[in-house]
A protein has these predicted regions:
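Short acidic, glycine/proline-rich loop/turn micro-motifs
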Residues: 77-80, 192-196
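Residue-level detector of flexible, active-site-proximal loop/helix-junction positions
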Residues: 72-74, 112-114, 188, 206, ...
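Short, conserved loop/turn and helix-capping segments at secondary-structure boundaries
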Residues: 83, 87, 150, 154, ...
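Histidine- and/or cysteine-centered catalytic micro-motif in compact active-site loops
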Residues: 142, 186-187, 205, 216
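Amphipathic alpha-helical segments that form well-ordered structural scaffolds
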Residues: 92, 155, 159, 208-215
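Internal alpha/beta domain cores that form substrate/cofactor-binding pockets in large enzymes
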Residues: 66, 94, 99, 103-186, ...
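Active-site rim/loop-helix segments in enzyme catalytic domains that contact anionic ligands
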Residues: 2-132, 162, 303, 311-316
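C-terminal accessory domains and tails appended to enzymatic cores
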Residues: 2-33, 169-170, 177, 192, ...
């Protein structure tokens, strides 16, 4: 007969097998590589545009990476019907798996422009997180420009705590680690400007970043072209692969390169005398777990630099 969890003489059922399923505190002794990192964006191109360099760095070093999109992106086009856009963008996410070498790209079936922090979405994301058990989740800041981005940020922060609550979604086992949450870089200043706590030089991955962008044909060569300052007549034909790579470099690669300019002081502090051309920047959320020294050291060994600006006096309060 299975033992039951007893607290103050009350039995709480056999599913716990006599043990509290939660880890009391994630320490050095709990951390065992490879690192598991989950990039959670609103649309099936958000993690790619902002984080593909970091993702590729992790994959090359043998760590586990998954991408997640909270909606199917079916409104991201000026001509095609939504149903066709959604199918097409799902296919583009499959190309990203092969290009970046990530494990999976999970795309939720929420319509574009309709992501909300509902109970249904919170449960769905909790199960996705628990199944993978990431050490780190990367997502949008709650004050990003798109309503879907803001809702995704809220969902991640809500789910991050609930991941460790056994009676929430009890069908999905609680993982041994509550994730650290990092925010992708952005340019917004209200209610607070982005704070670059972790900086990583991704210049050596420029070709892979360009090819990852190019996987999203419906976006980079159609929908976003006017937003990037070009017309559809400027886009090379689909069979001109090198021409399209050159077009990405002049029309869209600034989405990565601009971070080096916007956060030049942080980049100079992280890489004195180096002046890297392509960097990605991340802010540590106050939600989630603080990385243990072994995780910080591992990321540093990959070329990342922690600037520690997130530390506050609360870390000294016992």
């Amino acid at each position: 007969m299975e033992s039951k969890l007893k607290i103050n003489g009350i039995e709480y059922g056999s599913r716990f097998r006599g043990e509290d399923p939660r880890v009391p505190g994630f320490t050095e002794s709990h951390f065992k590589p490879p690192l598991r990192v989950m990039f959670v964006g609103a649309h099936p191109d958000d993690p790619d545009v902002r984080c593909s360099g970091f993702a590729r760095t992790l994959v090359e070093a043998g760590h586990r990476v998954r991408f997640v999109a909270l909606c199917n992106g079916d409104k991201g086009h000026q001509f095609m019907p939504s149903e066709e856009v959604g199918r097409r963008r799902y296919g583009e996410s499959r190309k990203v798996i092969a290009t970046l070498g990530i494990e999976d790209y999970i795309v939720a079936d929420n319509p574009d422009c309709e992501v909300e922090p509902t109970l249904e979405n919170r449960r769905w994301l909790t199960r996705v997180i628990r199944e993978f058990g990431p050490h780190i989740i990367v997502t949008h800041r709650p004050n990003d420009y798109h309503c879907d981005h803001r809702a995704t940020a809220t969902l991640v922060q809500d789910a991050t705590y609930l991941v460790g609550v056994p009676l929430w979604c009890p069908d999905a086992p609680v993982p041994e680690v509550i994730p650290t949450v990092l925010f992708m870089g952005d340019r917004f200043t209200q209610p607070a400007p982005f704070r670059p706590d972790f900086v990583i030089d991704v210049s050596r991955h420029e070709d892979v970043i360009v090819d990852t962008f190019a996987c999203h044909e419906s976006q980079m060569f159609e929908w976003l072209v006017p937003e990037h300052g070009y017309s559809l007549a400027d886009v090379p034909p689909a069979d001109d692969v090198e021409g399209r790579r050159r077009f990405i470099r002049k029309s869209a690669l600034h989405l990565v390169a601009d971070y080096a300019r916007a956060f030049d002081e942080a980049v100079a502090k992280a890489y004195p005398g180096r002046n890297p051309r392509l960097v990605e920047v991340y802010e540590k959320s106050e939600y989630g777990r603080t990385p243990v020294p072994a995780e910080r050291s591992l990321l540093a060994s990959l070329g990342g630099v922690w600037l520690d600006s997130v530390q506050s006096k609360w870390t000294q309060v016992k």
